Amino acid sequence: MELTTRTMATAKNIALIAHDHCKTSLLAWSKKHKSLLKKHHLYATGTTGNLIQNETGLSVTNMLSGPMGGDQQIGSLISEGKIDVLIFFWDPLNSVPHDPDVKALLRLATVWNIPVATNLASADFIVSSPLFSESVDIQVPDYQHYLNGRLK
C-alpha cells in the first residue's frame, strides 16, 4: 500500500470510548488529565461522552451510544482523518453485543496509523508524550492511489 503524510495539529481530535465496566476508570482518567484534555477536541460515544462532559465540564462532541452505532461513527471519523488519537478502555473479560464493531474500530485505528490506548498505562503514556502537544506528521494509506489502482 502506498502511503502519504497527514499532519496532526497541535490540538488533537481525541476519541474517548469505554465499555460499561471501564467507564469509571476512563472518567477518573479524564478528571486527572482535564487540564491537558481541555486543549484538544474531544469526541466520544454517547454514554461515555455525557458522563465525561457532566462530571468534568469538558466539551465533548457525542456520537450515539456504542451498541447503537457510536463505535462505527467514530470509525468513520478515523477513516476520514478526523480523529488523531483513540482512547478506548474496553473490557477484555466480557463480550458485548457489538464486538464486531469494536474489532472494526481497532482495525481502522491501525490502518490509519493513529495512537491507541486501551488501558490506563497506555493512555498515560500517550498524554505524557511530548508529541501529544505538538504538530505531528504520520504516514497513512494513500487512498487516492489505492482507488486509482482498483479502477484500472
UniProtKB/Swiss-Prot annotation:
Biological processes per GO annotation: methylglyoxal biosynthetic process
Gene Ontology cellular-component terms listed: cytosol
Record has Kinase as a keyword: no
Top-level taxon of origin: Bacteria
Top-rank EC class of the record's enzyme: lyase
PROSITE patterns: METHYLGLYOXAL_SYNTH, MGS
Annotated keywords: Lyase
Signal sequence bounds: none
Known catalytic reactions: dihydroxyacetone phosphate = methylglyoxal + phosphate
UniProt cross-references to InterPro entries, sorted A to Z: Methylgl_synth, Methylglyoxal_synth_AS, MGS-like_dom, MGS-like_dom_sf
Pfam hit, one: MGS
Record-annotated active site: D71
Annotated MGS-like domain residues: 6-152
Binding residue positions for substrate: H19, K23, T45, G46, T47, T48, S65, G66, H98
Gene Ontology molecular-function annotations: methylglyoxal synthase activity
EC code(s) of this entry: 4.2.3.3
Family label: Belongs to the methylglyoxal synthase family.
NCBIfam families per record: MGSA, PRK05234.1
Entry function: Catalyzes the formation of methylglyoxal from dihydroxyacetone phosphate.
Name of the protein in its database record: Methylglyoxal synthase
Gene name per UniProt: mgsA
